[in-house]
């Protein structure tokens, strides 16, 4: 017999409802429980559940009650029968990421995984797909309570079904050592996931310069905490690439390529300005999709660049530095070069050290991701340039910094080509991660340059020239690749697995008969 009580408990669905299901609800029965009161439930429409549901697992604060039943918030129940109003609501669409499998593999081999990357790139959403329970440190309703627990009884915050996701963990840096110690105690893999948009903050100090113990990170986490860098979506992840050409397959057999691409110049310009931000990808209207990059840029210069290390920085100067960085995408511009560019576009006096501090802060919040130099064994003693190549982590940051839209890029093909290179490098990095690889850049004293070298852990590598399209540019890229390949001393290292000109536009991929160079439109590439 159920006795009515005046109380209401929030219940939410597990994220397994088909995105095609429309919001609807149906009344099963009206009754109340003496402890639970009135209850509303969201359930999978395909699950066959009785009117009375016997949850078999104790639940609190969002942990699961049963494998395919419900989640319940702010209440603790065990072996109670619940009934009430069942509803089905449309869940947010989740586009699969290349990093899904990478994260799964890391959870099987490490006690904890740190997921890093820029704000808005989908770190929390990625981790939530594999999380057993979630702690959101940025939740304003619980922030004060969570911070207090982090200082006094952090083990309570670590308790929960594994893998336990701790979102925005850097708000309380004590989590780093606590997770490391807990992993040691449990001696099991796949216990925790940590997500955040910045590197761990520097320890806070008191008025005498002493590190405050609560904020101090003592250990690196080596051997216990694995790292995963998540970038904005590649074209394959956003479903803008057909995926007919697999980068991984090219390392096994590059004799033939086949497929097609549906990206023309107008579409490429839009994709470059939109970027790979998940919210922008999911938005149906182009204007709304393009706004995401500008919102991100404004947030970086007005707030994020200051919060990363609690240093007050000038918003306008941050804008000018990022604009200069955008103009130097794909180059080895020094800090001095960027400084000179800023001075040419303004009157303010500043030093190399000032520019460097801003660039360093932008790297710490994953806005900038430069490409390091590749140093192969060559037949001749050619001096290799070791300067990093300048890139933002996503091309839309460059277009937002310069205030450009798709039409502006088409009207300035030189700038378009430079920023497209950033898009191509972003995608290559995403795909290389799935292959245990990294992307480098090559340039020697004779200015022989290769835009991207995809180098795998096993020593295999591929040489890539990035061109927006056109016969002349493709021919020039192929000549560069064959020249560099001939310089490599194959007695000391492997021959390249493939030579590829990665283009922005083109209807289909093909292999050139005269030199074996692959020509692959980016709209056909995948991991």
PLM regions with names:
Residues 135-160:
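Short glycine-rich substrate-engagement loop in P-loop NTPases that contacts/grips substrate
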Residues 202-331:
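Interdomain motor-coupling "hinge/lid" segment immediately C-terminal to the ATP-binding subdomain
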Residues 126:
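Hydrophobic positions on the alpha1 helix immediately C-terminal to the Walker A/P-loop
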Residues 52, 504-527:
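Domain-level recognition of nuclease-like catalytic cores that cleave nucleotide substrates
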Residues 71-104:
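N-terminal pre-Walker A segment at the start of P-loop NTPase domains
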Residues 123:
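Conserved lysine of the Walker
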Residues 177-200:
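Conserved catalytic/switch belt of AAA+ P-loop NTPases
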Residues 285-460:
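Accessory nucleic acid-recognition modules appended to NTPase machines
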